[in-house]
A protein has these predicted regions:
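Blade-terminus and WD-like Trp-Asp/Gly-His loop motifs, strongest in beta-propeller folds
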Residues: 1, 40-48, 87-96, 134-142
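Cationic-aromatic interfacial patches
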Residues: 110
């Protein structure tokens, strides 16, 4: 499994791979500078890691690591300052990454990035509150997302094929 740790120097949060049956053989797969790096998702074929770089409460970025080559690539534009881009997950299609962002908006929205075209489709722009997090079903045909609406959390269920969603009512 993959994990992040500051074990190299106590400050920089590098990415490692470890076989749980042989923890002493953990190997670094990405050396970084700074403590705000963390793993977001692993592709279905185990070839790509999505990695988040947390700069501040108002700025974060998403990267992709090719596990075989060790090549780190920008997913979101690192030059975008003051933009939150995080909580990224691979979608069902190999060219899509689902993530949260406040780019060009007051609120964090759920969005899909087409990796090939770099086009972003914002899915929750009609909700004028922050989307706090989201989670796919195991088959990734549905997802739930949580909003914070005036201090109250609301849950929504989305069909990932057509991106339609509705609020889940009467949660105990």
């Amino acid at each position: 499994f993959y994990f992040s740790s500051t074990k190299r120097n106590g400050g920089d949060r590098d990415i490692y791979y470890m076989d749980p049956k042989n923890p002493s053989a953990a190997k670094m797969v990405l050396q970084v500078k700074g403590g705000g790096w963390g793993i977001l998702d692993l592709s279905k074929d185990n070839s790509q890691l999505l990695i988040g770089e947390y700069i501040s409460a108002n700025e974060s970025h998403i990267w992709s690591l090719d596990v075989a080559s060790g090549k780190l690539s920008e997913v979101t534009d690192r030059a975008s300052k003051g933009v939150i881009q995080g909580d990224a997950k691979f979608g069902n299609l190999t060219n899509e990454i689902w993530f949260l962002t406040d780019k060009d908006n007051e609120f964090e929205r759920l969005a899909i990035l087409d990796v090939k075209t770099k086009k972003v489709n914002y899915l929750t722009s009609k909700i004028n509150w922050n989307v706090e997090n989201f989670s796919f079903s195991e088959d990734k045909k549905q997802l739930v997302f949580i909003t914070n609406e005036a201090g109250r959390n609301k849950m929504y269920l989305m069909n990932t094929k057509d991106q339609s969603y509705s609020e889940v009512k009467n949660i105990p």
